[in-house]
Each structure stands twice: as C-alpha cells, then as structure tokens.
Amino acid sequence: MPLEQRSQHCKPEEGLEAQGEALGLVGAQAPATEEQETASSSSTLVEVTLREVPAAESPSPPHSPQGASTLPTTINYTLWSQSDEGSSNEEQEGPSTFPDLETSFQVALSRKMAELVHFLLLKYRAREPFTKAEMLGSVIRNFQDFFPVIFSKASEYLQLVFGIEVVEVVRIGHLYILVTCLGLSYDGLLGDNQIVPKTGLLIIVLAIIAKEGDCAPEEKIWEELSVLEASDGREDSVFAHPRKLLTQDLVQENYLEYRQVPGSDPACYEFLWGPRALVETSYVKVLHHLLKISGGPHISYPPLHEWAFREGEE
C-alpha cells in the first residue's frame, strides 16, 4: 500500500482543493469534538499568507539570526471541521446561516497557526528557548482561548514537515525548546542561505526505505515524495534542490547510500540507509514516529508551503 495518500498540487493563485487527510492538521481535535464525532470529517482548505498580516502582528522574536528574514512567509493549512450530517439538529436547522462568519473565523485561526509556525522556525534557527507566555503575547493574542489547538497543530506540522519537535523543559512557566526528532543530529541549516530544516524530509526518506526493506528504488523515492512537492527535477519546492539534497548532501553526511543496482542495464539506482542513520536511529523508531504523528496505520502528508519569497536562494 502506498506510503502516502495521493494529492494534487495546485498553484496558490488557483486556490487549493481538498487533498485528503492532511497529516499534522488532523490529530489535534479537541477531546470533546472527538467524542462527539458520529460521521466522517469534512475539510476546508484555507490559504494563509503572512504577508497579509499587519506588521504589528507579525512575530518578531528578539535576537533573530542573520538570514532569518529569508524564512517562508506563506503557509497553506487545512482546517478540519467535523460534520454531523446524520444529526437531527442539522436537519431541523438546515444550512448554517452564518457561512461568511464561519469562513472568516477559519481564515483567522489558520493565520494564527501560520504565524506560530513562522515564530517557532525563527526560534529554532536562533536556538532560543521560548515560553507559553511569549507565544500568547507575541503571536496568539486575542485567540488565547484557542491556544491549545493552535499550538498542537503547529507542533504536529513542525514534526512532520521539518522534523522538529517541541519539548517542554520546565513545566512551571511552560518553557520550551526545539530539537530534531528521533535524536538525529542533522538539520541541513549549515549556512545563511538555508531557509528551513531538512530533518523532516530525511525521516520520510528513511521511512520509505524501511517500508521497502533494506533498500528502495530511486523511482519509488521520487514517487512517494511527489506529494511533498519535492519530486525529482522540481527545484522550486520547500526543500530547495531536492535531488542534490538526497543524492549528494545526505550521502556525504552518511545518512543515505545512493548506488547503482548491480547488473542493471540501463543503469538504475537505489537508496539505502547510511551508517550514520543506523547509529542514530532505527527502522522501528522511524516508522513508529510517523505512525504516532498520523494517529493511525495510514501515513499521509499535509500540503506543503508555497513560499512567497526566495531571498538568499540561488
């Protein structure tokens, strides 16, 4: 069974269409909502552009490192609303009489999630701890009642897409730090031009290989990654130059091995776990990590970002 649930890429100017179960934006439903769920979920995709947020509301943590301005400013999110199509109340009341109000609220909530992801990426690059009070004051503001779900969804998104985990180190005062998932010591942030951590992509590639056995054909890797908009030959994805990242950078870092399949003619290539990956993690840990985030046996990927700016990129 394919590792991902297929989704169609669409350009930001064309809007977004439903893309299946967007992992990282599904598992953070409020407990009461989960208990009351009696029917299948329906999804609404909302595009959130941080450039639309007034400057006074944009998160700007102190002591941001050089190059922080090159961080992505546009994030596409999926807002999941539970539908209770079989309920008698809905049949009696009919369609919502406040569709515009509901849509406006969803957009506002998505904008806050986008702001928080941006804020957390800046904190990670600066290697700075942060507190709940700082998030509430700098980002969440008037949405404090919705902080738990906003924080949970933003944290899940960071884990899956970027391979970054939020860890609470001091319960009193709620002090947090950001670390790479699974104890991996690589994040790809080696220079000022590096915009986002690459650990998430590494974990997904390692999971694809683990799922296939000891090795995975190159075409299988690109097939699975196509849903991440990191397909072979696509150099404008969130993971800039994905082919170079997989076949050179991660090979040089000893996380992956990239070799020709013995006896193949024409030449075919395959990926294997490198020695560094075998030392730092395991097949079981990688697969369990993705299953834990997805909350079920089927792994799917969220729609990734369409970056508004590429400052510092070649």
Swiss-Prot record:
Q: What does this protein do?
A: Not known, though may play a role tumor transformation or progression. In vitro promotes cell viability in melanoma cell lines.
**Chain intervals for the UniProt region annotation (Disordered):** 1-72
User: What is this protein's gene name?
Assistant: MAGEA12
* Assigned keywords, A-Z: Tumor antigen
For this record, the Gene Ontology CC terms, alphabetical, are: nucleus
The protein depicted here goes by the name: Melanoma-associated antigen 12
Can you give the residue ranges of the MAGE domain?
109-308
Name the GO terms of the biological process aspect. negative regulation of transcription by RNA polymerase II
Q: Which InterPro entries match?
A: MAGE, MAGE_N, MAGE_WH1, MAGE_WH2, MHD_dom
Stored Gene3D superfamilies:
MAGE homology domain, winged helix WH1 motif, MAGE homology domain, winged helix WH2 motif
The molecular function terms of the Gene Ontology recorded here are:
histone deacetylase binding
Q: Where is the composition biased (Low complexity)?
A: 17-44
Looking at the record's lineage, which domain of life comes first?
Eukaryota
- Composition bias of kind Basic and acidic residues appears in 1-14
